[in-house]
Amino acid sequence: MPKHYRPTGKKKEGNAARYMTRSQALKHLQVNLNLFRRLCIVKGIFPREPKKKIKGNHHTYYHVKDIAFLMHEPLLEKFREIKTYQKKVKKAKAKKNEELARLLLTRQPTYKLDRLIRERYPTFIDALRDLDDCLTMVHLFAVLPASDRENLEVKRVHNCRRLTHEWQAYISRSHALRKVFVSVKGIYYQAEIEGQKITWLTPHAIQQVFTNDVDFGVLLTFLEFYETLLAFINFKLYHSLNVKYPPILDSRLEALAADLYALSRYIDASSRGMAVEPKVDASFSSQSNDREESELRLAQLQHQLPSSEPGALMHLVADNNKEVEEDEETRVCKSLFKDLKFFLSREVPRESLQLVITAFGGMVSWEGEGAPFKEDDESITHHIIDKPSAGHLYLSRVYVQPQWIYDCVNARIILPTEKYLVGRIPPPHLSPFVDNEAEGYVPDYAETIKRLQAAARNEVLPLPGVGKEDLEDPQNLLYAGVMSRAEEAEAAKNKKKMAAQEKQYHEELKMEINGSKDVVAPVLAEGEGEESVPDAMQIAQEDADMPKVLMSRKKRKLYDAMKISQSRKRSGVEIIEQRKKRLNDTQPSS
């Protein structure tokens, strides 16, 4: 028997040994499809794409090591135990033994995903990097109505709302918010925590409707994992501020749907108490609860104090009592709305504006009981309103639309309010997530904002083609001007020569077509022979194609893809400019 002989079925090699199909994985684990999906979601296992699919393209493949990883998961045994226990409950209900069924439901086995969080995210930075989808999902379910058909319970909706308010309270107190954009899908936010940029989407404050084309079973499994992950992150973030977690809210404010305001007051009171009294004697342990409650009430009453007052005690690290070093971006964001007081009308998105204003150093209030200050407060500087008001108008404040808040935040300056007054069409709401220079089109209002930013920094905007280093070094600018003038003169001379040669070529070609025997004297430059001169455009095209000929196939394809992308971008810019021109032409007539 030759050495290379291998009996069929004895050993697999290559992709057949590294991957298995989903049906093979189900047989290997002895679970159904729903349970397999739950395990893959909570464990972070996803399908693979092998280069050579042994069983065909219509199968889903998983790595063999991932399936072996699931085989030894303790959660698998817990799911089987729960399934067996549910059969006992079902049997008791079938025998109409309601008391036994109720007793069994109270003793049903439970499980936690804490171990999986620590397993999937060894460090806190790893968890922050994977937080975008988590925040978007939790914010979505926080506004959904409870549904028995989709197995969405009320307590789960309340838990999502609690987690989102805790997250927003930390973002507001730490001034970590960086960008906000209101779109048709919802409101996009971007915050920066420990150097990580976190972007999430929140739905608008309207009635949400369940759709039939979404598998809510899979979404609820993701939500179960994301709730645990966000609770871990909130715990870590609150302890970095010396604040106890979970927070204890004022029941009165919580009943008035002022959860975010109650959380902010709780953070202020907790940080003040922990920073002033880092150690408490055991003899005063009986009075500690009363002291904490009194400080919480005091913080709720002292709502008119700006957040940059002795609340700087919030910026203490948990392990040592030293101030946290703030970067320049945080300092700018913290003082953008400093000493400004805003009042929100009923029709504006209160929760979003409250988060944005407080995150950038402002004070905010609203209509209703439990608000920090009343509408008739003379110190209010801006009244956020979305429709003309028939009530009393105060001359000491400015009535602006909500878009003014978001545009000021993205521009990092206080914009003029003339274009945002009530009843006027506001300027375009520009996205801070788009790089206008890279896209090749800069809107007019973006240029206006850039000039306002330069004026706020007492800077001089350079002319097109002139950089800041040229303004700082005039001699360099003069030298560049002289060189560019010499280059322009030489280019003009070459252009004139090429035009003469091209004209001669066209005349010769025309005479040849007409059958004329007259010969036009060639127009030659000094030092050139009597050879026929090719077209200037052809020479330029050959020069442009020469580097492409010398490229490898891979680089040539990449170059072609870049050219296609640039042409599409240029065509998109041309479409935008045409629409802008048509709009400008129709505006005066209307």
Curated annotation (Swiss-Prot):
The UniProt entry's GO biological process terms, in alphabetical order, are: maturation of 5.8S rRNA from tricistronic rRNA transcript (SSU-rRNA, 5.8S rRNA, LSU-rRNA); maturation of LSU-rRNA from tricistronic rRNA transcript (SSU-rRNA, 5.8S rRNA, LSU-rRNA); regulation of ribosome biogenesis; regulation of rRNA processing
BRCT domain residues = 332-422
Localization (cell): Nucleus, Nucleolus; Nucleus, Nucleoplasm
Name the domain of life this protein comes from. Eukaryota
Tell me the SUPFAM superfamilies matching this sequence.
BRCT domain (SSF52113)
Main localization of the protein described in the UniProt heading: nucleus
UniProt-listed Pfam families: BRCT_2, Pescadillo_N
Record key words, sorted? Nucleus, Ribosome biogenesis, rRNA processing
Asked if the keyword Nucleotide-binding belongs to this entry, the reply reads no
Q: Where is this region: Disordered?
A: 561-590
| Gene3D superfamilies hit by this protein | BRCT domain
Which molecular-function annotations from GO does this UniProt entry contain? mRNA binding; ribonucleoprotein complex binding
Q: What more is known? A: Plants silencing PES display severely compromised root meristem structures and a reduction of the primary root length of up to two-thirds.
- Function comment: Required for maturation of ribosomal RNAs and formation of the large ribosomal subunit. Plays an essential role in cell growth and survival through its regulation of ribosome biogenesis and mitotic progression. Required for normal root cell growth and differentiation.
The protein in question is named Pescadillo homolog
The species this protein belongs to is Arabidopsis thaliana (Mouse-ear cress)
Which gene name belongs to this protein? PES
